[in-house]
Amino acid sequence: ERVFARVTGGESSVLDGTIDLGATPADLILMNPSGFVVGPNSQFSQVGELTLFAGNAIEFAGGARLDLETAADALPETEPVGFITDTRGDVQVIGATLGQGGSGLSIIGGDVSFRSGGAALTGGGGDVRIDATALTLSGGSVIGTVSPEGQAGGEIRIDAGTVSLEGGNIRTVAAGGHGGEVLISGGSFHANGGSVQSVSFGSEPAGAVTIAMDDTISGVMDSFVDAASYGDGGLSPVTLK
């Protein structure tokens, strides 16, 4: 099942309480072109895959779309196939932990920032995907996937105009299965402390780590970029280009 919720008032949504989808878990897409502020008291109960979408329209199979003008009873029943971002609101994650379940997590917006220990975490093979004008991680914030024994790790895919690590960490961890890949692409990457890692602890290798930017990569020598297998998994590539 999938639940859509959109905000049309022109102000950013402040999420600092509990969103509970009831007895049956469902994927949740929150849409607000003006953006989101996710505070430390936020909790998501019975939520499968979570998407925070700070753009202006969602496209569905068959050509239908959901925007701020679409009538509530005209919501398409087909699968969403694209997110339209002619305008982008900002997404701030302040001391909150998004995800944690076995499903995926996606954030699509303008300036996306994690600070004061904010985190985007998935377990059980769920992927984390971020599409942003700019992404900043500071104050010990984390984007990560963690997978249990025998299960392949979830991937982290980031596409942003600028990516800045100010003491933040991007990491995939697999206890026994193949580690999840980390792919960071976009315009420029700057690190001032922090890390980008894929780690495995079993017989399978860690995932590949790739930072592929069109413009510049800087500060990597002051940070930690690694793909490490602390078992029998062998070597995995780290690519900067």
Per-segment meaning from a language model:
Residues E1-G125, D131, T136-S141, V146:
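Solvent-exposed adhesion/ligand-recognition segments of exported proteins
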Residues G55, A96, G110, G117, ...:
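Solvent-exposed loop/turn tips at the surfaces of repeat/solenoid architectures
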Residues A96-T97, A120-L121, I143-Q151, I170-G177, ...:
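Tandem-repeat/low-complexity and Cys-motif detector
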Residues E59, S113-F114, A134-G139, Q151-A152, ...:
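Short loop/beta submotifs within extracellular cysteine-rich repeat domains
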Residues A5, G17, A64-L66, D73, ...:
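Residue-level marker of intrinsically disordered, low-complexity segments enriched
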